[in-house]
Amino acid sequence: IARPTEALSLSAGAFYSDPALNQTTANGTEFGISGSAGYFVIGEVAYRLNPEKGDTGLPGRYRAGGYYDSNQYAFLDNPGRQQMGNYGLFLLGEQMVYREGGPGSNQGLTVFGGLIYAPQQRINTLPWFASAGATYRGLVPGRDEDAAIFALYYGGFSRDLPGQTYELVLEWAYAMAVTRWLTVQPDLQYVINPGGRSSVGNAVVVGAQLAVEF
């Protein structure tokens, strides 16, 4: 990670990437690198708006970057054919638009969004993925650390997958800070076009998350 200024940062990483790790028949301990393994590299530039705790302006963070994976990928419409390498680009951002209290307060309304684009349609199930939403921290009086969340997620399927168009998910959640170290978050999702198929009925998904901070 490099930080040319307090607001601007550059980061990159390189990782060992082995598709064989997904095989359910693999077991035991293995520290070697298989001949089928490749590498995954990712980099991003990030800009923070009003990053200091005492800044009077509303904070925000914006990121742009890309990635490359050197492994072999099968064609979606012909699994017998493969190509080497896959890449994508991403844009992510979050910005507080309303704040309760003075500078440094984390209570208020923050909006966020993201876009991921993997242009090679023949090997990427979801070449397009977009998300947007909002979080309001301290919406309920007396619950300053709770957060009400609404988000939507859109995935556009590859044109090489006939019958699959898009999937849209609407999500509502409420993160309750039970203690300083325990957060409980019930979650409700409504899934439109599950799996990208209009022939499949829309679905309601109910869940919850439990977070413990040590």
Task: For the regions a language model picked out, list residue spans one by one.
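Residue-level signature of outer-membrane beta-barrel architecture
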Residues: I1-R3, Y47-L49, Q95-V97, Y136-G138, ...
